[in-house]
A protein has these predicted regions:
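Cytochrome P450 core scaffold surrounding the K-helix E-X-X-R motif
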Residues: 3, 22-25, 29-34
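An acidic- and aromatic-residue-enriched active-site/binding cleft used to recognize and process polar
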Residues: 17-19, 26-28, 58
Length: 196
């Protein structure tokens, strides 16, 4: 195991006006386990606690071969974006869904300061996780308020908004209160999450 790696390939962080919206939790206080083959038993290292999907009930694996492919960035113009294929990071899901595909594209639409995250897959069982600094408030079908941001999602159902207690001393230096996890179940094979 890489002693500083997290299973977070394709995860996204987002700030609005200097305030955290979608976050990376970080790492807890270092212990012997952190630098052992058991490091991925630590919740903050797992893809389920990053802004990523669980595909067919499985998370990303650790190892150099479990990485994004076909990474394309477009950084000019009014809609800079990054896209990538994430299926290689989910070998257990690939064993369940032969020929698994899972692509993610994130676009910043500059004129409206809107971020659009689009996921496409051939898997039928996908739960999306989004870690937030502020407690999300479910407003109506497909609409959330997250601190200063408004969010909407398409082709998914809200499963839960969970509280992630921040009790570790090192994490408390980064976060002054608990964090939250939004869990959405994709209802099809295409998903869109828009944040303004």
């Amino acid at each position: 195991a890489d002693s500083h790696n997290h299973n977070d390939t394709g995860s996204v962080t987002l700030y609005k006006n200097g305030h955290p919206i979608l976050v990376d939790i970080g790492v807890e206080t270092y212990t012997q386990k952190t630098f052992s083959p058991r490091r991925y038993e630590i919740w903050t290292m797992q893809s389920g606690y990053h802004n990523l999907p669980a595909i067919c009930g499985t998370d990303q694996k650790d190892g150099e071969e479990y990485r994004a492919g076909n990474v394309v960035t477009e950084l000019t113009g009014t809609e800079p974006s990054i896209s990538m294929e994430l299926s290689a990071a989910y070998p257990d899901a690939g064993a369940i869904v032969p020929g698994l595909t899972y692509s993610r594209k994130v676009t910043l639409k500059k004129p409206s300061n809107t971020v659009v995250l689009e996921d496409h897959t051939n898997a039928q069982d996908v739960i999306l996780n989004f870690i937030t600094y502020e407690k999300p408030v479910f407003l109506s079908d497909g609409k959330l308020s997250i601190g200063e941001a408004s969010a909407s999602f398409e082709e998914a159902d809200l499963l839960a908004i969970e509280t992630l207690p921040i009790t570790d001393a090192r994490l408390k230096t980064a976060w002054d209160h608990d964090l939250y996890r939004i869990r959405l179940k994709m209802s099809g094979t295409d998903f869109q999450f828009t944040i303004k």
